[in-house]
Amino acid sequence: MANSLLTPTAVTREALRILHQKLNFIGNVDRQYDSQFAVEGAKIGSQLKVRLPNEYTVRTGKTIAVQDTTETSETITMATQKGVDVEFSSADLSLSIDDFGTRILEPMMCVLAANIESDALSMYNDVYNQVNNVGSSATFNTILQGRKKLVDNLAGSTGLKCNLDTQTNVDMVDVLKGLFNNPTNISKQYLDGMLGQTGGFNFFENTLMPRHTTGSDDGTGDYLTNDATAQTGSTLTIDTGAGTLLKGDIFTIAGVNRVHPETKVDTGQLQQFVVTTSTGASATSLSISPSIVATGARQNVTNGAANNSALTKVGGASVDHDVSLGYAKDAFAFVTADLRMPRGVDFAAREVMDGISMRIVSDYDISNDEFPTRIDVLYGYKTLRAQLATRFANN
């Protein structure tokens, strides 16, 4: 039987299929495809608004207390276009789609997936919940403490995912090998070195998990808040300290406790915060997340930060540690949009699979019977609800 030439659509669909199966972080977060660009095409800088859930307060007693519905949303910018460029021959196009996928598309999609996934994993810097186990190997209790943080923040008790760095995966498989597990999990642990589903999470090993280096502040509380009025909001006025605080560093503020998200009752636990912009020792202000909210429907702490309250950084001075990430699907969003389809080229297609849009464009080099080809994805990502994620700081 004669070979049939591969079509642009077939090649694009196969490339998307391979790409999708290699994205084990992006594949588990909220993926949104913005179809508004399907005709004219999107470009870098195009934006998508994502509405967040409304929050309300509860009245006690018979007297009505009407409250406004305040809609909040996050804007995600399609800020990154990445692609892989290659050249193939007419003979390559006569291959079966399986052979073409193995020889050409598989290695292309591996490197593209790694770069896209690495970008998206930088969202760990937005996460302020952290199980601090710096300098030690992960234990089963470490994982359960992370699950507790998510459940306490109303992430739910089912459908939770966890991406492990490779060393933490080793430590956890070793910890769990002697415990009771169902036969399927035992097979994964012994034969594949994988955890599967246990401890309330579905686990995925990921070689792209980042490492975090903390600032030079030693975490002894030498940074103090500096304002006569209890501070709220996303910027703290502080006295100068003795070391640096880097983006992604976790800290607590003396006397500022976390409240239950619905009842607003004091949990008795210090609220964790994350530094959103790196600062030097001479800084007198600090950008933080979450924003301190002491009243109303979005209240997240018992009170604002009183004057001279100590900031205690987690993790020690200039410490380099592994990061693993537990989360509910709605914590993060990854958005793609259709790129413009060019005219007058030999070979072009654009396809969408499970929220990911990809474009392939190929021209023809008549002198050499070659097809210079580009594969592109335009995307953006953002942490939407950081309270539904937690970091594990190990090793």
Predicted regions and their residues:
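Exposed beta-sheet edge/beta-hairpin loop segments within beta-rich domains
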Residues: 97-99, 237-241, 360-367
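Beta-strand elements of well-folded, non-transmembrane domains
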Residues: 54, 90, 209, 294, ...
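Long, contiguous amphipathic alpha-helices that act as assembly "spine/axial" helices in icosahedral shell
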Residues: 50, 76-142, 151-168, 191-205, ...
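Glycine- and charge-enriched low-complexity intrinsically disordered segments
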Residues: 277-337
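Autoprocessing Asn-cyclization modules and mimics
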Residues: 171-291, 391-392
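Hydrophobic, glycine-enriched assembly/anchoring segments
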Residues: 358-395
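N-terminal "assembly arms/tails" that initiate or stabilize quaternary assembly
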Residues: 1-74, 389
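A generic local secondary-structure boundary/capping motif
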Residues: 37-39, 147-154, 190-194, 242, ...
